[in-house]
Swiss-Prot record:
Pfam families: FAM199X
Gene encoding the protein: fam199x
Keywords (A to Z) from UniProt: Coiled coil
Zinc in keyword set: no
Originating species: Xenopus tropicalis
Region entry Disordered, spans: 237-350
Keyword Transport recorded: no
Protein name in the entry: Protein FAM199X
Amino acid sequence: MSEGLYEKFLAPDEPFPLLSQRGSASEEGCLDVSDFGCQLSSCHRTDPLHRFHSNRWNLTSCGTSVASSECSEELFSSVSVGDQDDCYSLLDDQDFTSFDLFPEGSVCSDVSSSISTYWDWSDSEFEWQLPGSDIASGSDVLSDIIPSIPSSPCLPSRKKNKHRNLDELPWSAMTNDEQVEYIEYLSRKVSTEMGLREQLDIIKIIDPTAQISPTDSEFIIELNCLTDEKLKQVRSYIKEHSPRQRSTRESWKRTSYSTASTSGVSGASVSSSSASMVSTASSTGSSGGNSASNSSANMSRTHSDSNLSASAAERIRDSKKRSKQRKLQQKALRKRQLKEQRQARKERLSGLFLNEEVLSVKVNEEDHEGDVDVLM
């Protein structure tokens, strides 16, 4: 085969480039495709730039490209048959897989093995067309040529651990972090919303053997002291003695007497009006009396609520003031302890006080029998 045989493709701007040029007639048994005027085109594409571009064979599905000189020589050198009748029979069958286009070990064989994973050559991806026949046309959609690759299934999203409501959990069902968090929440709630008596009661519930001196400014709660039953008692005690519950209970006690009296008056007026049925004036008068009594009850209730809210605000201010004083005392105590530790460390490192001995001296004053005259 001559060196000029199949040396290049035609320019890519021509609509249907020929695959080969006419070869030498001296070589026997060599099939020259141009003898029959055959053209290779895509059955789905009308734009040749997607197949041949800048004299290179572009394989977009694999992301690789092979030089046209290498592919063309190996591609057409293997298509050799005995006579022209066999060539016509091969061309009429339009079975592209019957040709040994890519010999074993060639440059294009590796490409063909990778292409076979994406394209099925038996579906007549390419077809041979004779001159004068209609050109196959199709939609210019990339999905017609390159098959869709199934996407990998989406990974299941990780479920985030929701924050549990610790007020409803028993003590044994909490983790260590949740127990520490809930103890801090309870101590902050009790110290800011309750008085000294309620705090002592809660301490006695948690640790009945705890001994608290009047000078103690804080109480440390150990995690192993709490149980499910103790935590249940603490929660019920906080619910009963919280400022909001206490204010609503006191307001209910104060308004119970006024509501009882107004309900008695309204019930009497309604019964008298329903029994007599004399005129509509009596019913309107009774309804007016009921509205007046209800308005007076509402006024007394709002007045008591305002007093309770003022007392609750004052109690909260006092608790904040006490907590601030307690923090200042703790800070001063910590500062004094750090100073003593620092001084002891300095003395130990200097070595000047290793042989120190502490002696106690006591002086007994002698009682003088008589007065001493200073003027003499």
